[in-house]
């Protein structure tokens, strides 16, 4: 990973045009080729970005006499011909790190057990539900559970111990990807957790995702209230 803190301006040229005026920003270049531009706000969200596959060409900027100005132009281009044109005026800091291969998200014991129990008792989501498989592989990571509802339609289930907005966003990305598969679509979503935050529930319902609160003890066969559907 390459991290560059620099004063720069950015122009996006593609389906539409956008401009970021000169300011100090973080430029992040990942090993997969992606490039993103960050400000010191917006949490994890970049101001602009280009996802792989894309190319990055860096060219020194010269004046009319052909002398180097100390600035450089980064041109990031994807296969569609869309470009990020980053004019780097001054580099404050630049570091490179080899992070190696990431092991991926490791669920805590309760989440993993919830997934196992729900897969064994998939009809807790509704009569007629059948399991396709756990940890259904996709290009952006495994879906916790893939199953079919009583109408024979595909359902993707994301399981969390405590369900927040990040979990809903993750499930949304899975649904967008899975619904491109002619053999699977339409794919519906279920967000299942022991506790679902109100903001996450509102966002999920707005996106047509069903929320399910899971009673861990009940799924383990210990006397408790049954799971509640919203």
From Swiss-Prot:
GO CC annotations on file: cytoplasm
A Pfam entry, by short name: NucS_N
GO molecular function: DNA binding; single-stranded DNA endodeoxyribonuclease activity
Superkingdom, natural source: Bacteria
Catalytic EC class: hydrolase
Localization per record: Cytoplasm
InterPro entries for this protein: Endonuclease_NucS, NucS_C, NucS_N, NucS_N_sf, Restrct_endonuc-II-like, tRNA_endonuc-like_dom_sf
Nuclease recorded as keyword: yes
Keywords: Cytoplasm, DNA-binding, Endonuclease, Hydrolase, Nuclease
Ranges in coiled-coil conformation: none
Gene3D superfamilies tied to this protein: 2.70.180.20, 3.40.1350.10
EC number per UniProt: 3.1.-.-
Signal peptide (residue range): none
UniProt similarity note: Belongs to the NucS endonuclease family.
Function: Cleaves both 3' and 5' ssDNA extremities of branched DNA structures.
Entry protein name: Endonuclease NucS
Organism the protein comes from: Corynebacterium glutamicum (strain R)
Recorded name of the encoding gene: nucS
